[in-house]
Amino acid sequence: MTQTLSQLENSGAFIERHIGPDAAQQQEMLNAVGAQSLNALTGQIVPKDIQLATPPQVGAPATEYAALAELKAIASRNKRFTSYIGMGYTAVQLPPVILRNMLENPGWYTAYTPYQPEVSQGRLEALLNFQQVTLDLTGLDMASASLLDEATAAAEAMAMAKRVSKLKNANRFFVASDVHPQTLDVVRTRAETFGFEVIVDDAQKVLDHQDVFGVLLQQVGTTGEIHDYTALISELKSRKIVVSVAADIMALVLLTAPGKQGADIVFGSAQRFGVPMGYGGPHAAFFAAKDEYKRSMPGRIIGVSKDAAGNTALRMAMQTREQHIRREKANSNICTSQVLLANIASLYAVYHGPVGLKRIANRIHRLTDILAAGLQQKGLKLRHAHYFDTLCVEVADKEGVLARAEAAEINLRSDILNAVGITLDETTTRENVMQLFSVLLGDNHGLDIDTLDKDVAHDSRSIQPAMLRDDEILTHPVFNRYHSETEMMRYMHSLERKDLALNQAMIPLGSCTMKLNAAAEMIPITWPEFAELHPFCPPEQAEGYQQMIAQLADWLVKLTGYDAVCMQPNSGAQGEYAGLLAIRHYHESRNEGHRDICLIPASAHGTNPASAHMAGMQVVVVACDKNGNIDLADLRAKAEQAGDNLSCIMVTYPSTHGVYEETIREVCEVVHQFGGQVYLDGANMNAQVGITSPGFIGADVSHLNLHKTFCIPHGGGGPGMGPIGVKAHLAPFVPGHSVVQIEGMLTRQGAVSAAPFGSASILPISWMYIRMMGAEGLKKASQVAILNANYIASRLQDAFPVLYTGRDGRVAHECILDIRPLKEETGISELDIAKRLIDYGFHAPTMSFPVAGTLMVEPTESESKVELDRFIDAMLAIRAEIDQVKAGVWPLEDNPLVNAPHIQSELVAEWAHPYSREVAVFPAGVADKYWPTVKRLDDVYGDRNLFCSCVPISEYQ
């Protein structure tokens, strides 16, 4: 045997698991594209002046088992105290049936945002259920399908209040003094760029302030007080002031709906509905508003529509409000939301139903009443008489109480003057309450739970009678039908089967990087050491998180060529916003706050102009030449014209057109020459890692989509993470946090997310990916992504011309297929091809972005040659079908393309088409058949007949 022990140990085994094509397949594809090796191919494609001489030093690869053991040892450094800190975060009990069948199920977590509704009906139904939960609990008319977290939802509510306000000259936003501090932090950050003045005061003093366009109230207040705001809201409405309420979703099960009290906007975190704290996220926010404001709402909204056969079908409604269409005029820059987490919360409500939720909420409240009664019996004073789950307890010996709590491995809220905060939750037991008595009163308190229970059961006054809900919630059958585990399991499976995810087929969406989310990467997110930590626990309890985050940040610094990384932004769009804020504050620190012009190429992703607008910048578009590259002459002219007002350029690399622009360094130099900064959008980082880097190219700041390049799954539309890398001069200007000091960051800036490290509990996914791939594997992943894209382009270019190529006719990691000539010639559109691909078992590529009338294909490195060939064969077969239409064999108005997709019921219905049933549903001998459950959606009907809540069960049958 000639192999060494090191070879037999095969520490790089995961690289071969992650990368789809094996060595033989790679060589076949290299031969097909006319390249000798991966190095030769990337050497030809990537401009010489930006190629790294050696890959970034992020270490050797580790096996799945070694990496898991290493991360487990790090996780064990976290201390799992029982946290009663509250402040919008509580421990939960995630039902195992949801844990196993959704959170740990690739059929749910590997799907993409449901832009293609025909292959997304399952998660769209779950999201519609989420909207129904929101509507029932808030008492409002229109709900979104989730926002990023409660604090960013508050910022969106403020922006929306200004959009809909009739007080056009008012420029002040009032925040009640008992709003969560992290929410106030994010609101202040957003208000600064919008030019709003934020006033913080007791809610009852709001009427003392002039020129207020909007008000933010908290129900329940951050220290636990239940407010009856009915009269105040009525007075505010009489003055045309828009009222927003941040609400606790579990408290709303028992309390009067804020919408019923007159609130215009209600939002909050859905974390309490089954989603672990995870050191801050990811969690879904809910958001609702009055019907009259629906077209000003931020984020995704699921609506009920019809398909081509007239059957009920679901889709994302009113997309013309959103960044991918309206760009800088969009309501927000939201792209990723929190679909997976919203669906967990939605199914938590389905599983428990109204009876179960009321039992949980009443039990939490009863234990809180018992705790309050015992403390008051022993002479302690409560700051608030009315509460749901949170007590603000005044204590003389605060240090002693906190010391006893620490000794008992308990966290209390400690930032309240002369008092401690205690928030109970669904995991709290009577034993926990007895332990709290001992911490606050000493061991000899002599209190008895059962005796206290009898007292409070007959005489609880902690919720005002006027604040008790008197209407029914969750009356729709979906919330009253699936309470046995068998029924719940089957319901979830029925939803999953309606959708197309990576566990069934390649999802070749350009600009989306739908790569493998390996099981070994996903396992740590459910470890209790990561899942159960409160984001505001003492830092010495989170040493494992700190070590993991520091290591990940160090690796990302090396991979990007930057000097520092901030982990706070909890989506790519948030990363863009944070990066642009860093640029803005950098200019202000140099007394150049007048620099507010942001140059953006015409090809840019829609979030770029939307984020620039949010950051208070003016967008100036830079033209692209006939080859899809930035027009350097136009760039120079626009930069010179902007002069001392130039703030930055936002550029994507490789370009959104799928090529490595030769002049990227010159682009950076031109912008720097005029005093601007270079923001390099990290959307296409999967074609850079190990080959080049933003810092090496000459950029100053980038966001990284960890849910693209670094393997966090898309979750059907979230979660995502968008940390930013910055050069040293921008490091002081990255987001900070008002509650938690971020170790190693000398920043005094405001927050952009509720938690200091954003969605911290999904960072282990990226840690695992980098650790298992190592420097060698990461570079190879980028190279194979480029090879796969060029293989597809070379094999399809005769049937579907590739719109843009770089030198030698190559593309980067994705390619744009130009459908416009075919459409002009035959009448068949890119939409028809996209829908026909469903019949072949594929999710469509990205349609009409960045160029109308095109399909953008990104295969990623994870797809094998077998799957690539299957896709190519499907596309070639579709081209042959188009030729049949062109030849007149099938009429333009009745052929397999315009009628696609085809569903099972059509097989047994009367068949009057000029093509066979077999051609319709088993084209080209498709073996592993995916069946869509609806035909093509009628988008016009959906927006003209907007309906965004649950429909009768019979409509689905």
Curated annotation (Swiss-Prot):
One function term, GO molecular function aspect: glycine binding
Root EC class: oxidoreductase
Membrane-traversing stretches: none
Keywords (A to Z) from UniProt: Oxidoreductase, Pyridoxal phosphate
Cofactor needs: pyridoxal 5'-phosphate
Gene Ontology CC terms: cytosol; glycine cleavage complex
Entry keyword Oxidoreductase: yes
Reactions mediated catalytically: N(6)-[(R)-lipoyl]-L-lysyl-[glycine-cleavage complex H protein] + glycine + H(+) = N(6)-[(R)-S(8)-aminomethyldihydrolipoyl]-L-lysyl-[glycine-cleavage complex H protein] + CO2
CDD domains assigned: GDC-P (cd00613)
GO biological process: glycine decarboxylation via glycine cleavage system
Modified residues (N6-(pyridoxal phosphate)lysine): 708
Keyword Calcium part of the UniProt annotation: no
InterPro entries in the record: GcvP, GDC-P_C, GDC-P_N, GDC_P, PyrdxlP-dep_Trfase, PyrdxlP-dep_Trfase_major, PyrdxlP-dep_Trfase_small
EC number: 1.4.4.2
Primary role: The glycine cleavage system catalyzes the degradation of glycine. The P protein binds the alpha-amino group of glycine through its pyridoxal phosphate cofactor; CO(2) is released and the remaining methylamine moiety is then transferred to the lipoamide cofactor of the H protein.
Similarity comment: Belongs to the GcvP family.
Subunit-structure text: The glycine cleavage system is composed of four proteins: P, T, L and H.
NCBIfam families reported in the protein's UniProt record: gcvP, PRK04366.1
Official protein name in the record: Glycine dehydrogenase (decarboxylating)
Record organism: Escherichia coli (strain SMS-3-5 / SECEC)
Taxonomic classification: Bacteria, Pseudomonadati, Pseudomonadota, Gammaproteobacteria, Enterobacterales
